[in-house]
A protein has these predicted regions:
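Cysteine/selenocysteine-centered motifs that mediate thiol-based redox chemistry or coordinate metal-sulfur cofactors
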Residues: 147-166
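Short acidic-glycine loop/turn motifs at beta-strand connectors
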Residues: 32-35, 80-81, 114-118
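Phosphate/ribose-recognition catalytic cores of enzymes acting on nucleotide-derived substrates
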Residues: 53-96, 102, 106-109
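A short, polar/proline- and glycine-enriched secondary-structure boundary/capping micro-motif
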Residues: 48-53, 99-100, 130-134
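A hydrophobic, small-residue-rich beta->alpha segment in the mid-to-C-terminal subdomain
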Residues: 107-150
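Short acidic, glycine-rich loop/turn motifs
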Residues: 15-20, 43, 78-80, 93-95, ...
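Short, well-ordered strand-loop elements centered on a beta-strand within folded domains, enriched
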Residues: 37-40, 83-90, 118-126
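Charge-rich, low-complexity N-terminal segments
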Residues: 1-60
Length: 166
């Protein structure tokens, strides 16, 4: 193997929800500036997941952005043909990296922005309310709601997440 054919750095993304591992999957590390970590991974779900407003399916590729100091992650979703489907955002505690693992705790709230920017929707607010986080950790709940509001404010702009992800 020549020096020019180095394998890309890999890590495992671990998504935790309510103290349990929800999903774990391998990803290619694209960058880590000490605060923002970006990775690329194929759709890690089994089969097709149809939300009604978007379908995640085998062949889709996610370019995912995580922050060590922000309460969210942003995932650009592309179809197998390379076309952008949109951006799926998870409200999370700040990401924690440890060795070859990136651990992210999902706080139930989500946001979707379609590729054309016409469909911006808040998701799973009912799950968040039922989670009890506002009672068990009011500071985290407040940070989660503020993060969702901040992402929505970016999502409705004509340039969407362009500046955030640049």
């Amino acid at each position: 193997m020549s020096a020019n054919s180095a394998e890309p750095a890999r890590l495992e993304v671990v998504l935790v929800k309510a103290g349990r591992t929800k999903i774990r999957y391998p990803a290619e590390l694209l960058g880590d500036d000490g605060n923002r970590i970006s990775v690329r991974a194929p759709w890690a779900g089994s089969g097709v997941r149809d939300f009604g407003f978007v379908r995640f399916e085998p062949g889709d590729v996610f370019t995912e952005y995580y922050w060590r100091d922000r309460w969210y992650s942003v995932k650009e979703v592309r179809a197998a043909d390379g076309s952008v489907k949109g951006w799926y955002c998870d409200i999370t505690r700040p990401a924690v990296s440890s060795g070859a693992q990136l651990v992210v705790e999902d706080l139930d709230l989500d946001l979707w922005r379609s590729a054309d920017g016409r469909d911006v929707r808040r998701l799973d607010e009912d799950e968040f309310a039922e989670s009890g986080l506002t009672e068990t950790d009011p500071e985290a709940a407040s940070a989660a709601v503020a993060a969702l509001d901040a992402l929505e404010a970016l999502a409705i702009r004509p340039d969407g997440f362009a500046r955030l992800l640049a």
